[in-house]
């Protein structure tokens, strides 16, 4: 199941992280200043491979430190290093599962080749962004582990064997839709499915039409909910992306135009500007050719 899910940190963490972003570390005081940083150790194992993720947490400063990952094979250390600063200018590499009382390090054979990878899920400390993962792959020729860093953005991911072939796809949401057509609260995101092979992640979403169909159906019902008063342009944009992936772009845009004229699709953008921006955005992001 999921190392961490789509929803981001809980309310307590979002509020604290937002205060840090706006006012600095001194703004967040959740315990007495005298409390010392508390050390933590997480362990994960599969076969002969064991990963140990250690760190300290200072609750008064809302800050993690001394983050270190060690990977052993048959009891012999093959990798040991302190974590680098997060990509994208994040202020702190936080264990993604810490505040949900879950592990953030996993040993699992993602690609089904018999050699387990080590996955470290992290968060870099914003109101709801950003989640990222470090995936460590063993290279027998060099007897070393090489990391791949992937930024998920405002969402996490789940592992799922969608192809039923023994390998695991990584299912997430397309974060590029955040704020594109509405506020974050009124944005929605089409499903995005990645495959890990030979140390690389590739987008394989179009392969999984049934997953796209289920996602499109849920988005459509959300957009057309008669109780919804806020903008639904962000939801419709995500739905249109799904439709493009299954070859229904022309029908989707006709539907959008008809419902925009009747007022059932509404938001900050006028009908013409929304349709123009949506076409341009879907071309730029690879959904529409």
Regions of interest found by a model, annotated:
Residues 17-28:
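Bacterial N-terminal signal peptides
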Residues 30-32:
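N-terminal signal peptide c-region/cleavage motif recognized by signal peptidases
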Residues 34-63, 172-289:
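Acidic, small-residue rich beta-repeat scaffolds with periodic aromatic anchors
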Residues 48-54, 108-123, 163-175:
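Acidic/hydrophobic-patterned starts of short beta strands in beta-sheet-rich repeat architectures
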Residues 72-74, 130-146, 183-202:
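Beta-propeller blade repeat segments, especially FG-GAP/WD-type strand-to-loop junctions
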Residues 74-78, 107-115, 139-144, 159-168, ...:
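A short, structured loop/turn motif at beta-sheet edges
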Residues 82-103, 150-158, 213-214:
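Repeat-based blade/solenoid architectures
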């Amino acid at each position: 199941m999921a190392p961490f899910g789509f929803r981001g940190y809980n309310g307590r963490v979002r509020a604290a992280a937002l205060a840090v972003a706006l006012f600095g570390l001194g703004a967040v005081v959740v315990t007495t200043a005298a409390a010392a940083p508390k050390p933590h150790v997480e362990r994960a194992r599969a076969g002969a491979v064991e990963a140990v993720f250690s760190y300290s947490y200072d609750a008064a400063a809302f800050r993690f430190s001394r983050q270190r990952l060690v990977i052993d094979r048959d009891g012999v250390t093959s990798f040991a290093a302190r974590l680098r600063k997060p990509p994208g200018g994040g202020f702190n590499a936080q264990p993604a599962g810490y505040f949900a009382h879950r592990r953030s390090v996993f040993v699992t054979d993602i690609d089904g080749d018999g050699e387990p990878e080590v996955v470290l899920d992290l968060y870099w400390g914003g109101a709801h962004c950003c989640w990222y993962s470090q995936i460590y792959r063993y290279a027998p020729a060099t007897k070393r582990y090489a990391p791949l860093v992937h930024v998920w953005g405002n969402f996490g991911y789940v592992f799922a064997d969608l192809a039923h072939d023994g390998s695991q796809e990584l299912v997430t949401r397309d974060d590029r839709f955040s704020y594109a057509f509405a506020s974050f609260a009124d944005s929605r995101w089409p499903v995005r499915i990645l495959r890990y092979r030979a140390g690389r992640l590739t987008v394989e979403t179009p392969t999984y039409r049934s997953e796209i169909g289920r996602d499109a159906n849920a988005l459509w019902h959300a957009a057309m909910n008669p109780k919804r008063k806020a903008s639904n342009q962000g939801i419709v944009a995500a739905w249109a992306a799904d439709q493009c992936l299954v070859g229904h772009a022309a029908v989707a845009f006709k539907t959008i135009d008809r419902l925009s004229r009747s007022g059932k699709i509404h938001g900050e953008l006028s009908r013409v500007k929304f349709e123009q921006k949506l076409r341009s955005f879907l071309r730029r992001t690879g959904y529409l050719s």
